[in-house]
Curated annotation (Swiss-Prot):
It catalyses: S-methyl-5'-thioadenosine + phosphate = 5-(methylsulfanyl)-alpha-D-ribose 1-phosphate + adenine. This is S-methyl-5'-thioadenosine phosphorylase. It comes from Prochlorococcus marinus (strain SARG / CCMP1375 / SS120). The keyword Glycosyltransferase applies. The lineage of its organism: Bacteria, Bacillati, Cyanobacteriota, Cyanophyceae, Synechococcales. One of its GO terms (molecular function) is S-methyl-5-thioadenosine phosphorylase activity. One of its GO terms (cellular component) is cytosol. CDD domains: MTAP_SsMTAPII_like_MTIP.
Length: 314
């Protein structure tokens, strides 16, 4: 049921760009976005990974002229907290289905006055304040250090922001760039924490994107976020504190628009097949010699290392 994964050897160089053959677009839907109605000819796959089961079935279909794989990160019935999401299983499953780009529509709180509820942000940096999650595939005797200087793919982010600006109502705004503060959750911030993150210059606060971005980079998948602003966290004296009701209300108002932006971006990706530095992220990142890595670990990470270490056979 699962197609052969897409390796860097299948990238054709033409001197200016590279053609990614048969690659798919992944969409990781967050709170309030558990499906995209415009995806056609959907087939569902249940995949078992070396890291357990993903959050939900993976739905493969057509959107914007290309094949996409949709996955609800919290599960379609929202059963996983941000800490409990099986991030490694999700990213492994997407890569096993030839996903080489990921768009991540996600709920966030605003940490800056000018970034208003119902605006959207395409961040370009993050600060990680989580402490309970596995953040790498490379452990248990295999070490890799990928570059995370630019954690969100600049090319993918530009396409997403451009399509967002075209579709956004005049009263709202798409903000290009900014730092995403990643908190553990599931509780929202204290007022002191919210003010601290503001003093750092962070633009939005969320609970999931940085974990996905790290793992996607190791999996050589280009990743970017469409951060949908639902509230002002708890720092703004002129607005009520963030609550589940407020988040859900504003997400419902933004869900259709976010789906349209994702579809429009998918159309751009299907035409451009944009290359990304993320697609060869492991090229100069693998530290451990393959002959020093156990068979168990080699088998788990073979999906990512085959192009550099050769195919693993027991």
């Amino acid at each position: 049921m699962i197609n052969k994964h897409f390796s860097s050897e299948e990238i054709e160089q033409d001197g200016k760009s590279c053609l990614l053959k048969n690659a798919r677009l992944g969409v990781l839907g967050g709170s309030g976005l558990y499906s995209i109605d415009s995806i056609e000819n959907i087939k569902e796959l249940d995949i078992e990974t070396p890291y357990g089961k993903p959050s939900d079935s993976l739905r493969i279909g057509n959107l914007g002229g290309m094949e996409v794989v949709f996955l609800a990160r919290h599960g379609r019935h929202h059963i996983y907290t941000p800490t409990e999401i099986p991030y490694r299983a999700n990213i492994w499953a997407l890569r096993s289905l030839n996903v080489r780009w990921i768009l991540s529509p996600s709920a966030v709180g605003s940490l800056q006055e000018q970034v208003r509820p119902l605006d959207m942000v395409v961040p370009d940096q993050f600060i990680d304040r989580t402490h309970q999650r596995p953040l790498t595939f490379f452990c248990d005797g295999a070490v890799a250090h990928v570059t995370m200087a630019d954690p969100f793919c600049p090319t993918l982010s530009r396409l997403l922001a451009e399509e967002g600006e075209l579709l956004m109502p005049e009263a709202r705004q798409v903000h290009k760039g900014g730092t995403y503060l990643a908190m553990e959750g599931p509780a929202f911030s204290t007022r002191a924490e919210s003010q601290l993150y503001r003093s750092w210059g962070c633009k939005v606060i969320g609970m999931t994107n940085h974990t996905e971005a790290r793992l996607a980079r190791e999996a050589e998948i280009a990743y970017t976020s469409l951060s949908m602003v639902t509230d002002y966290d708890c720092w703004h004296e002129g607005f009520g504190n963030v609550s589940v009701d407020l988040v859900i209300e504003n997400l419902a108002a933004n869900a259709k628009l976010a789906s349209k932006i994702v579809e429009a971006t998918a159309k751009r990706i299907s035409k451009l097949l944009p290359p990304s530095e993320a697609h060869t992220a492991l090229k100069n990142s693998l530290m451990t010699s393959k002959d020093k890595v156990s068979e168990t670990t080699r088998e788990k990470i073979n999906l990512f290392t085959e192009n550099y270490w050769g195919k693993f056979n027991k």
